[in-house]
Structures are given as C-alpha cells and as structure tokens.
C-alpha cells in the first residue's frame, strides 16, 4: 500500500489542477470558446441527459419493469439496501450485493501491477476494475453487462436492446448522437447508449466530494467533533482501516478511500461459495478475493461485503475487531486458505474505540444525500458538460477506446 501511494503521489499535482475542490483561475479553467469546444459541450450535455433517461428506463429489461435505478437507488448512495437484488424475472436474483455507483467512474482500470514492499521485495497484485471481482476492465465494459445478465435485466441480445432504445421516449436524442445514417446499426445504437451511461456516471452528481470529511480536509477543522476526531485516530492507527482505505490522496484528490486492491476478508458464508477474483483470473491464490470498495457514503450502503452478509456498520466493525477471537460469532467462511489473517480479526479495540470509529465513518457521507436522496438528485447541471470535458483525459482508460465503427490499425505494442 505504501508503494502504491508513493507512485501515485506523482499524479497528484496534475489532479489538483482540475479537482472539483480546486479554486478556479485562468490557468486552471481556460475559457473553452472555440467552436470545437462548444460542440463537445453540446454532445456531452446530450449524452448526460440521455444517460439519465437510460438509467431510469424500465422498458430495457425482459420482462419490462427493471431499470438501472432499481438496484442503484439514490437514497442509498446509488446502492441497494437488499442483500441481493431481484432481477427482471422475479424468481431470479443476483448473488452479490449491489455496490454504490458513486465515484465508480474514478475506480482505476483493472490491472496486474508490480509493487515493492517496505522490505524491498517485488510483488505482483491485481487492482481496480469494476464489479466485486474486477471482471470489467473499466466503466464502459461494466455498464453493458447488466442488460444481458439473466439475473438482472435479462435481454437476449444487443439487437433487442437497440430495438427498445429506438422505441423509447428519448429516441430522438439518442438518434442525434448516433446519426441518421447509422441509426439502423444495432451495434452503434447500443454503443452510444453505453457512452451516455458512462457520461452520466462521470458527472459531478456521482462524484460530489462534499462530505464532512472533505470539508475537514479543506481546512474546516471545527467541523469534526471530539468523538469523530478520536475515530479518525482509530481509523489510521489501531483499526488499520487506512491500510486499504487511505485518507491521503493516493489515486485521486480528494481521496477515494480505497486502494482498490483485492483481499479475502473471511466474511461469513452466504449461499453458494463465490470464487471472486480467482474465477476471473484462474489463479487459486486469488480465490475468494474481492475488490476493496470506496468507503465514501459507507453509512448509507448497508448491507456490507460482497454477499451482503454483514447488516450494519456496527457489525462490520465488530467483525474486523473480533473475527478470530473467542467472541467471534460468524459463520464459516467459504475459502479459509486464502483469508487475510494478518490485518484484521483481532484488533483489540474497546467498545468506545469501536463507537468512535463508527462515528467517523459517518463523516464520509456526502451531505447532499441527506437532504436530496431521490431521483431528483439526478438533475443535470449544464456545467457538468464542461466539467466532464475538462477532466476527460484523467478518467480511467475507457475514454481512449476507439469508436466501434472504426477499423483499427494493428499495433506491435
């Protein structure tokens, strides 16, 4: 983790220049007055509005009735309060808890990287990617999969999705993006729908950075009370939370509160054993490992862990503290051979320290969600287009994809 942080700190000066919290200046926010920039903003604005409509559209499932918003509800930080989410077919349900979509656009692309440990040893590890097992390299891959998963929206093909998009109330907006010449091309119709969803998830609505913790980092030292400050100390030191959910800006500024690495925490079994990352990579040493989530808005996203087996923040903290002690009360875990026995399980936190830590975890809640937790929180501000355009090169790798309709030159790289 320390090596990850030191490498990523090289990026922070550039990130700060376009951070949502950075003070505007002529150097940081040049006036994009060219015709090309104006056109780009218009396209992004149209994508944002269309992406919102796709996100809320219940006609894009079979049978109809299931939308992205069914499993990613604004009042729960765009997560799902149910252990697993029912699909379009009522007797089918997913096997994992639906994660929050907030800050998902900033999760680094799935990669296998080498790191140096503090002792100087070179190790290799997977990090990043979307879904609990990282199987989607980036957000563009992720937004496609739920449409065709038989436990989710249950469409049979891209042709079926394209047909429904052409019959939607927002079809003319989508057609404007696709172009009249290509409107009959199913692949291009769905391609642009995916881009619209990604553009929505990149917008400031999904990366507000306006929690009490953010205000504290910006210099409002009085905003945290004594218990929350004690909780921050527990978080960094005795609780070891900072090891995997660093408070420092290691991969984005403001921090995302995750290193996005993979670990087997030994969570209680729930249903069929889930291979996690190991199924995706085929590596037996990675069986049962899942990606570390961001802790932003964690107080709103219960239940917890990949299988929703821990129901409250209190239970999560108790699990980390007591898992390997005689006081542990949790079921057998699926894959004990790959469980992390070093960093959690017997933290020896007192009840007061656990209470303080929970109080601090509530400081990660974006404050607008406390007052505007509904579909109205998907309101798109025209300035979002400029924000998305200005930051486009710093979002993870999907932005550099070739258009599906282009013929790529073969590369030796």
Where are these regions (language model features)?
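Short glycine/threonine-rich turn/loop motifs
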Residues: 29-142, 210-332, 373-413
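Post-cleavage N-terminal segment of exported redox proteins
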Residues: 2-54, 145, 150, 154-229, ...
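Charge-dense polyanion-binding interfaces
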Residues: 332-341
């Amino acid at each position: 983790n320390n090596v990850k942080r030191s490498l990523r700190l090289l990026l922070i000066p550039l990130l700060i220049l376009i951070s949502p919290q950075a003070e505007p200046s002529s150097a940081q926010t040049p006036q994009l007055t060219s015709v090309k920039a104006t056109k780009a903003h218009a396209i992004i604005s149209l994508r944002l509005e269309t992406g919102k409509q796709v996100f809320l559209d219940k006609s894009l499932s079979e049978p109809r009735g299931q939308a992205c918003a069914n499993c990613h509800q604004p009042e729960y930080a765009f997560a799902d309060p149910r252990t697993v989410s029912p699909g379009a077919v009522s007797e089918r349900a997913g096997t994992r808890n639906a994660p929050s979509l907030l800050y998902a656009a900033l999760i680094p692309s799935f990669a296998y990287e080498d790191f140096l440990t503090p002792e100087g040893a070179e190790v290799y590890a997977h990090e990043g990617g979307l879904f609990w097992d990282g199987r989607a390299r980036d957000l563009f891959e992720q937004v496609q999969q739920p449409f065709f998963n038989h436990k989710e929206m249950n469409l049979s093909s891209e042709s079926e999705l394209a047909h429904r998009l052409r019959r939607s109330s927002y079809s003319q907006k989508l057609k404007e993006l696709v172009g009249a010449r290509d409107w009959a091309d199913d692949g291009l119709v769905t391609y642009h729908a995916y881009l619209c969803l990604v553009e929505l998830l990149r917008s400031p609505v999904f990366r507000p950075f306006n929690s009490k913790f953010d205000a504290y980092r910006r210099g409002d030292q009085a905003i945290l009370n004594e218990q929350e400050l004690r909780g921050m100390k527990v978080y960094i030191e005795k609780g070891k939370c900072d090891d995997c959910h660093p408070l420092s800006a290691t991969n984005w500024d403001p921090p995302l509160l995750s290193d996005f690495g993979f670990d087997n925490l030994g969570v209680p079994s729930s249903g069929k054993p889930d291979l996690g990352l190991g199924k995706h990579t085929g590596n037996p040493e990675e069986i049962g490992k899942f990606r570390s989530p961001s802790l932003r808005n964690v107080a709103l996203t219960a239940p917890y862990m990949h299988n929703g087996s821990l129901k409250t923040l209190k239970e999560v903290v108790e699990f980390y503290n007591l898992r390997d002690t005689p006081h542990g009360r949790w079921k057998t875990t699926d894959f004990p051979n790959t469980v992390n026995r070093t960093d959690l399980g017997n933290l020896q936190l007192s009840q007061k320290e656990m209470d303080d830590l929970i109080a601090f975890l509530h400081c990660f809640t974006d404050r607008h969600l406390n007052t505007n937790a509904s579909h109205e929180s998907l309101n798109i501000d025209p300035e979002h287009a400029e924000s998305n355009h200005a930051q486009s090169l710093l979002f993870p790798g999907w932005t550099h994809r070739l258009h599906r309709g282009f013929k790529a030159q073969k590369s030796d790289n």
